[in-house]
C-alpha cells in the first residue's frame, strides 16, 4: 500500500456525481487528504479512491463538506450523499468499522465555488483533520 488516495480529474460539466466518469480524463494525482488537488481548475469532476485504514474497532463519525456535489462510499456502501449543485453544504455520517483497511470512494463535482473537505468528528463533536496516515492506495 502507498500513502494517499488516487484522484482522477475529469472535464465534467454535469450536476450528478454518478455521471463524472463518462467525462474525459484530464489528469491523475495522489492526494494526502480528501481535497481538490492544487493543479485542478475549471470544470471539475473528481473521483478519489483507495482505502481508509482505521486504527481500532469503533463507531467513526465523518464530516464531508462540498460545493458543489459529493458522495462518500465506504466498504461499498453509499454512506454520504451530498450530491447536486449547491453552495457549501456539510453532512455528518457515521459507520461502525473494524480496525484495518476499508475501501473508500469520494466523488465530487464543481460548477462554481470549489470546496471539498472530509474531517473526523471526535467524541466531543469536535472536528479534526482526518489523519493522512489513514489514507492508502494500491
PLM region descriptions:
Residues 1-61, 65-138:
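Extracellular/secretory pathway-exposed regions associated with glycan biology
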Amino acid at each position: 500500500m502507498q500513502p494517499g488516495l488516487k484522484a482522477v480529474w475529469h472535464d465534467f460539466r454535469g450536476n450528478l456525481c454518478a455521471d463524472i466518469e463518462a467525462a474525459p480524463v484530464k489528469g491523475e494525482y495522489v492526494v494526502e487528504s480528501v481535497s481538490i488537488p492544487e493543479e485542478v481548475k475549471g470544470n471539475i469532476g473528481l473521483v478519489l479512491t483507495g482505502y481508509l485504514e482505521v486504527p481500532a474497532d469503533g463507531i467513526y463519525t465523518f464530516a464531508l463538506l462540498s460545493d458543489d456535489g459529493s458522495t462518500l462510499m465506504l466498504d461499498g456502501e453509499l454512506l454520504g450523499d451530498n450530491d447536486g449543485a449547491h453552495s457549501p453544504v456539510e453532512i455528518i455520517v457515521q459507520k461502525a468499522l473494524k480496525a484495518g483497511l476499508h475501501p473508500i470512494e469520494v466523488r465530487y463535482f464543481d460548477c462554481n465555488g470549489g470546496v471539498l473537505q472530509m474531517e473526523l468528528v471526535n467524541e466531543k463533536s469536535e472536528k479534526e483533520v482526518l489523519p493522512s496516515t489513514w489514507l492508502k492506495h494500491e
